[in-house]
Amino acid sequence: MKYGVLGTGMVGDALATKLAQLGHEVMMGGRSADHKNAQAWLAKVRGAKGTARIGTFADAAKFGETILNCTQGSATLEALKSVDAQDLAGKILIDVANPLDFSSGTMTLTIVNSDSLGESIQRAYPAAKVVKTLNTVNIQVMVNPVIVPGDHDLFICGEDAGAKQQVTALLREFGWRSIIDLGGIVNARATEQLMPIWMRLFTMFGSPLFNFKIVKT
């Protein structure tokens, strides 16, 4: 499978590295084709089972059969403007970002309550199959869930059932066992709005290596 990873930060690096290690073809895209972070990633994954290359956001979107949005959530929609909508049409777009704003000194969400980043992307690119997932865990947990002991859950939502099935299969490649399908993309609101409690727990624990577990009768 060919994956286009949009974003050269820590999230994009972690996911692109995991995909390459699993043997997939990966292109990391940034604002420029020669971004220093992308170049560092390319050097790091040399010798992985999969193939790796770098380019712009537009290059990665054109290359990938499945696209991962790993851009900073507050800047995602602006970043996606550089992508040709036709290069997203019919493709799965996995959105792992949260619309976070730290400019006031505390964390807030730039999109909240009656909307979400996941929904905003789906509206902007209606021909894409947006699937929201992995946005409720730290990057280390995203790609290596067993780092958190015991059973714990990952959420997924989106409009296209087939797309969610394909993303679920990828998540299982990552090692995820319990994946809860919340339904349509509107439920991205719920997962994005877990960020305040996630951040509070991170502050209390002094570590991001934790996750949520849903228990029912």
Model-derived features with residue positions:
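General beta-strand structural signal in soluble alpha/beta enzymes
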Residues: I54, K129-N135, I179-L182
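Rossmann-like NAD(P)-binding element
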Residues: R46-I92, N98-G105
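Rossmann-fold NAD(P)-binding glycine/threonine-rich loop
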Residues: A97-V146
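Rossmann-fold NAD(P)-dependent oxidoreductase module
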Residues: A14, K18, A124, L170
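Short, structured coil segments at secondary-structure junctions
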Residues: A89, Y125-P126, F174-G175
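Active-site-lining helix/loop region of Rossmann-like oxidoreductase modules
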Residues: H152-T217
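Short beta->alpha connector loops
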Residues: Q72-A75, T136-N138, D160-G162
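NAD(P)+-binding Rossmann beta1-loop-alpha1 motif at the extreme N-terminus of oxidoreductases
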Residues: M1-K44
